[in-house]
A protein has these predicted regions:
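Periplasmic c-type cytochrome electron-transfer domains
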Residues: 23-461
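Positively charged n-region of N-terminal signal peptides that target proteins for export
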Residues: 1-4
């Protein structure tokens, strides 16, 4: 009997040793990295004058806007008539000013979704849409189609979550919110969350030739894995567009002007016209002007001195242009192993680890090799991720390769913020029509320990 017991113990131990690594070591997203923010602040080599430009831009980026500019602590002008936020820094906040959506689970600055309180700020009478929650991401909403007399037509545009109706600085305005309940019932609403702005001056300073050469350098291996990729381009001159979820914006100035217009309702030199009905227009248009007298700023508590410097839109672009890229965490044995696996399974074929800038006007930003982990091309991601919106050459299921620098401290993932779990975000790439499907198959074939190493690597970025 004793000999049988010993044999049974040996057999059981051998069985546990055989299955142990798969069952005991369950892979999981480590979560957003703690400690100091690995991003924020100006690019380290900038000269004193360039640092001043950045600091002025930062002030404008953090400014809170109201309709009139006369509300206490809301000195910016031009909010509305429809809007999603009242400050650039409100949406771009994690892990530091210029980042992605804030949230309650931030190790750096835990805050609820600011859009919830914004709905009724200063007397506004908005209802909070059901897709905006205290513990969820900041979102914008777009309608896939719009109803016309002949049926339906493509839409794809941003529909502001809120209006200025009821606000103390918007007397007489009576503008209804979009009927989100009806459109949600039609499955006609898609969402997007803020993209981080860190290091975008380096991205802007990378030539089209460099981007095309980078994509060509992996063509053979990509072809074997079913990865194609193309660049979204400007319809006039054919140059590569690279900013936004679908790489739909050609320049940081256009990116900035669009953000002011569709997110805050502020008309500007790039988008000069209001987007809502008459009766709710309280300011001259455009409301943000570049290099000329700006009466709106003069009435906003500047002592009558009209602003003659760069507009807020130009300052936004300068902020993104001069902000330093994210700094990764110190490497560990696990993250180093994960970096090798990232290359082995093919993640790096789209998430290119490094690119090099061309000549730059800014000190220390010429011929710089940087690590965005993106090819800035758009790829078919399949209908599981498709938003059914076309922007330029980017079709309904195509998205720009999301840069992974800074992903270690990000709270929400994918274009619509549908998950806070990095592992779920990776596996969501496994759609039937997705170019990443074979890469995800190889990822899923890794051992749990290897998957954990890869996750640890990503959270170190």
């Amino acid at each position: 009997m004793k000999r049988q017991n010993v044999l049974m113990v040996v057999v059981c131990l051998g069985f546990v040793m055989q299955i142990g690594p798969r069952n005991v070591y369950a892979q999981s997203d480590p979560g957003p990295r703690g400690g100091d923010a690995g991003a924020g602040g100006y690019y380290s080599t900038l000269g004193a004058g360039e640092q001043d430009i950045f600091n002025q831009a930062l002030d404008a980026f953090m400014e809170v806007d109201s309709v009139s500019g006369l509300v206490a602590n809301e000195g910016g002008t031009g909010l509305g008539p429809t809007f999603n936020g009242n400050s650039c820094a409100q949406c771009h906040a994690q892990p530091a000013i210029g980042g992605s959506s804030p949230g309650l689970k931030s190790p750096q600055h835990p805050v609820p979704n600011p859009q919830v309180a914004l709905a009724t700020l200063d007397g506004a009478t908005n209802r909070v849409p059901p897709f905006v929650t205290a513990d969820g991401p900041v979102r914008e909403a777009r309608f896939v189609v719009t109803v016309t007399q002949r049926g339906f037509a493509p839409d794809g545009g941003v529909h502001g979550l809120f209006t200025i109706t009821g606000r103390t600085d918007a007397p007489g305005c009576n503008l209804a919110q979009p009927d989100f309940a009806t459109e949600l019932g039609r499955h006609n609403v898609i969402f997007r969350i803020p993209t981080p702005l860190f290091g975008l001056g380096l991205v802007e300073g990378t030539s089209d030739a460099t981007l095309r050469a980078n994509l060509d350098s992996t063509r053979e291996r990509r072809s074997r894995l079913g990865i194609r990729g193309q660049f979204n381009t400007n319809g006039n001159d054919g140059t590569i567009t690279r900013f936004g979820w679908k790489a739909q914006n050609k320049s940081l100035l256009i990116f900035s002007g669009e953000a002011y217009n569709v997110e805050q309702g502020i008309s500007n030199e790039v988008f000069p016209n209001e987007r809502a009905a008459l009766g709710c227009a309280f300011n001259p248009t455009p409301e943000s002007l570049a290099g000329i007298a700006d009466p709106g700023e003069a009435t906003a508590g500047t002592g009558g001195a009209a602003a003659t410097g760069p507009s807020d839109v130009v300052k936004f672009a300068n902020f993104a242009r001069l902000t330093a890229p994210p700094t990764p965490a110190a490497a560990t044995q696990s993250s180093q192993s994960g970096a090798q696996l990232f290359e082995k399974v093919g993640c790096s074929l789209c998430h290119s680890p490094s690119l090099t800038t061309d000549k730059s006007h800014f000190t220390g930003m010429s011929n710089v090799t940087y690590n965005p982990y993106s090819d800035f091309a758009v790829h078919h991601m399949g209908w599981q991720l498709a938003d059914r919106v076309t922007q330029g050459a980017a079709g309904p299921d195509e998205f720009r390769t999301a840069p992974l620098w800074g992903v270690g401290q990000r709270l929400f993932f994918l274009h619509d913020g549908r998950t806070a779990d990095l592992l779920q975000a990776i596996r969501a790439h496994d759609g039937r029509e997705s170019e990443a499907r074979e890469v995800i198959r190889q990822f899923n074939a890794l051992t749990p320990a290897q998957i954990q190493d890869l996750l640890n690597f990503l959270r170190s970025l």
